[in-house]
Amino acid sequence: MLIRLGLFLYDNLGGKTKIPKSSKVIFAKQYQNILQSKFTEGFRYYDVQVDDKKLVEMNIDDAKKKGAIIEEDTKVINANRIDNYWEITLNNNEKIKSKILINAAGPWINEIVNNVLKINAKKSIRLVRGSHIITKKLYEDEVAFTLQNEDNRIVFVIPYKGEYSLIGTTEVDVDTPDNPSISNEEKIYLINTINNHFIKQISQEDIVETYSGIRPLIEDFKDATKVTRDYIFDLNEDESKAPLLNIYGGKLTTYRKLAENVLLALNKYIPVN
């Protein structure tokens, strides 16, 4: 009932759309060659998929066309607030002056706040590693599965680049955002999830590739699965000094709305042409 209610909200909160509505599925009639017989029914819903790398590249290209200067492979090593502007020093010794500074460093946000801006971070984030495994295609249907484990976490199985299946994700607390990589325990967790749901059984020998990333979650709860994936702003301002906006949290699917809200938060500092 809760799943059906959630899907009803999913179907209707976005208003009119070309995406079909969700529906109930009897597994004896569909996917009986994929799922184990202990699973008798579920629900079908529709979603969209994005190439995250391509989306970021398109945003960068669009920003360049609108006059933005993009400093690739460059690190900010110092930032000083000098009255009504910021003086920012890069690792190539270039200095940039800016009337506004926005810290959108993701999982490195407090590293920037503490070590570069040299102010005390007001917000706490939790660094959570999410890992995926990629295997040869587990089934022929062009459909993704959402599998729920006994720990109440879900794992997605998604057709990937025509010949593969993408399986993930995990949630593991880490101390640093640098160089994330999947652990053996995470591999076993994802493999067991597949073997508990699918007829086809897999092992570590079936893994052809893995990748991991870090999610900067706003720390409000003890359980990593319950920490909010939303975002909050920390606006550091003084009437006589240049503002600093730190962005905590956020996710790719709402990046545009987040960016719009950044402009609203900084509206009084942005000159109107």
Regions found by a protein language model. Give the residues of each.
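A conserved short coil-to-beta-strand element within the FAD-binding core of flavoproteins
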Residues: E72-W86
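C-terminal catalytic lobe of FAD-dependent flavoproteins
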Residues: Y45-Y46, D52-L55, D62, L117-I167, ...
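Short, hydrophobic/proline-enriched secondary-structure or compact coil segments at domain edges
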Residues: F39-D47
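Flavin (primarily FAD) binding-site architecture
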Residues: N103-I119, E260
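Dinucleotide-binding Rossmann-like beta1-alpha1 core, especially the glycine-rich loop
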Residues: M1-Y31
